Curated annotation (Swiss-Prot):
A motif (Switch 2) lies at residues 64-81. A motif (Switch 1) lies at residues 32-46. Belongs to the small GTPase superfamily. Rab family. The modification Phosphothreonine is found at T73. This is Ras-related protein Rab-10. Keywords: Acetylation, Cell projection, Cytoplasm, Cytoplasmic vesicle, Endoplasmic reticulum, Endosome, Golgi apparatus, GTP-binding, Hydrolase, Isopeptide bond, Lipoprotein, Lysosome, Magnesium, Membrane, Metal-binding, Nucleotide-binding, Phosphoprotein, Prenylation, Protein transport, Transport, Ubl conjugation. The gene is Rab10.
Amino acid sequence: MAKKTYDLLFKLLLIGDSGVGKTCVLFRFSDDAFNTTFISTIEIDFKIKTVELQGKKIKLQIWDTAGQERFHTITTSYYRGAMGIMLVYDITNGKSFENISKWLRNIDQHANEDVERMLLRNKCDMDHKRVVPKGKGEQIAREHRIRFFETSAKANINIEKAFLTLPEDILRKTPVKEPNSENVDISSGGGVTGWKSKCC
């Protein structure tokens, strides 16, 4: 039997409208790569990265979910078992910020009650095209008592910091049991098709 190379397994989700840059954020953290064109995620795909925090090796299983409204029924089952969720909006897209409230309601309905949440104000390198003031994001974060980060996958701003802070908060919040790998289904998110979309 192969020796397990990690102490804990955390399932994290990236949630938000299509085109806000979730895939770019994920690839910047997992592969330290940035591409202006990715295939828009129709179902769900995930990346694995192991980090060391508080003396423990933690395997992060990070799921990139479809943002389109019509695919919410597909992603609902993936909330189950998530220990941390990053909500992402695009500072150049006012609708993506308005929909954060809907995503928060989705989390309340489908995720574990004690799931750790974080709000990302993405594409902060495009501040000259900003339509969502920073203060609005800070306000909604305060109202829901969640962390708030300004991020940019393109400029590599706060990506690693956000992805390390979320599991740190999970570690502090609850005593975490070591996972049974047999209970973790990583096969159902492999089917990805789609079209090209811009993200930062």
